[in-house]
A protein has these predicted regions:
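Catalytic core of pol beta-like nucleotidyltransferases
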Residues: 1-25, 33-39, 50-98
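Short beta-strand->loop micro-motif that forms the acidic, two-metal-ion catalytic signature
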Residues: 45-47
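Short glycine- and acidic-residue-rich catalytic loops of nucleotidyl-transferase/cyclase enzymes
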Residues: 41-43
Length: 98
């Protein structure tokens, strides 16, 4: 899979997530955004919400359930816009806003 195919899958995933969660942003990050992906790479996606809901333990499995409808290569992570979070800070630097 090439970078543009990963972006297309991320766009489809964003549409599915936006129907179920109050989505603030969605980023493609990791190997596809950095350009060092291989044929075995997963598709790292950061789902950014304004704040975590009380249903975090329901929201996270929902992300995994929705990914199965798009591609099992998608590896979602649920985040807030906490710039003190090293993962989120890295995503802001190297990720692709979808």
């Amino acid at each position: 899979m090439n970078k543009w195919q990963a972006i297309k899958l991320a766009q489809r995933y964003k549409a599915a997530v936006a129907e179920r969660l109050p989505l603030k942003a969605l980023y493609l990050y990791g190997s596809y955004s950095k350009g060092n992906h291989t044929e075995d790479s997963d598709i790292d996606i950061a789902v950014v919400v304004e704040r975590m809901s009380d249903d975090y333990f329901e929201d996270t499995p929902l992300l995994w359930k929705l990914k199965r409808k798009i591609s099992n290569l998608i590896e979602p992570v649920l985040l807030t816009e906490d710039t003190n979070n090293p993962l989120y800070a890295d995503i802001l630097k190297t990720g692709i806003l979808i």
